[in-house]
């Protein structure tokens, strides 16, 4: 015992010291020490507690609290380590007998953060968590693929649309090039024919001179049915041909005026 109360039973007279049962070859009992880091005042010291030893020398101590306290119990958890050469002196206050016992292990525990509850309450909480958690996780799993990820078929459809758009654009460009080539060839042929007619008129002095004041028809060339891109190309070519014919007619009129003055 420690403190003044224990020292009161230890006087200077000699006493008989007995070795306890823990010193026998096959001890029938064992003694342990328990060290708490913090023991709240709500623990009822008059009641017995519960000590459990699990795997890996893990120890759980459950002590009841004073009636009316919340929670009803306090839980401590820790571990135990064996003693090598440690003993404890036990003094009988009634007879004054002293008995020495060998210590088996030292248990060091700490109070859990959430004040402990009974085993029944722990099981109920676990069951409630199992009932609530699975539906939430299943809903998340069901909704996440449809909202966040695209299906492979939709990706293939998008790629196919892009390829078709590129192919149609290439076709329009090729048709525009072919139409421009044909129209350039038709305009060059019309220019050659007009130049030949002018040479014939100049070579025949007695014959009457004929002047074509009409504009060459652009529609003499082959007709094409084109798209919007081809229509734009045709308009550009028509404007250039009209400008050339206007310049040619002005040149002819100026030549005729000079001949009349002579």
Swiss-Prot record:
Domain of life (superkingdom): Eukaryota
Record has NADP as a keyword: no
Modified residues (Phosphoserine): 146, 151, 154
Recorded GO CC terms: nuclear speck; nucleoplasm; super elongation complex; transcription elongation factor complex
Chain segments annotated as transmembrane: none
Gene Ontology BP, a term: negative regulation of cell growth
Region named Disordered: 124-154, 170-232
Cellular compartment(s): Nucleus speckle
Segments of skewed composition (Low complexity): 174-192
A single MF term (Gene Ontology): transcription elongation factor activity
Composition-biased stretches (Polar residues): 124-144
Any Pfam family the entry gives: EAF
Chain intervals for the UniProt region annotation (Necessary for interaction with ELL): 17-104
Stretches for region Necessary for interaction with TCEA1 and transactivation activity: 248-262
Record region (Necessary for transactivation activity): 177-262
Keywords, in A-Z order: Activator, Apoptosis, Nucleus, Phosphoprotein, Transcription, Transcription regulation
Stated role: Acts as a transcriptional transactivator of ELL, ELL2 and TCEA1 elongation activities. Potent inducer of apoptosis in prostatic and non-prostatic cell lines.
UniProt similarity note: Belongs to the EAF family.
Complex formation: Component of the super elongation complex (SEC), at least composed of EAF1, EAF2, CDK9, MLLT3/AF9, AFF (AFF1 or AFF4), the P-TEFb complex and ELL (ELL, ELL2 or ELL3). Interacts with ELL, ELL2 and TCEA1.
PANTHER family (UniProt xref): ELL-ASSOCIATED FACTOR 2, ELL-ASSOCIATED FACTOR EAF
Protein name (Swiss-Prot/TrEMBL): ELL-associated factor 2
Organism: Rattus norvegicus
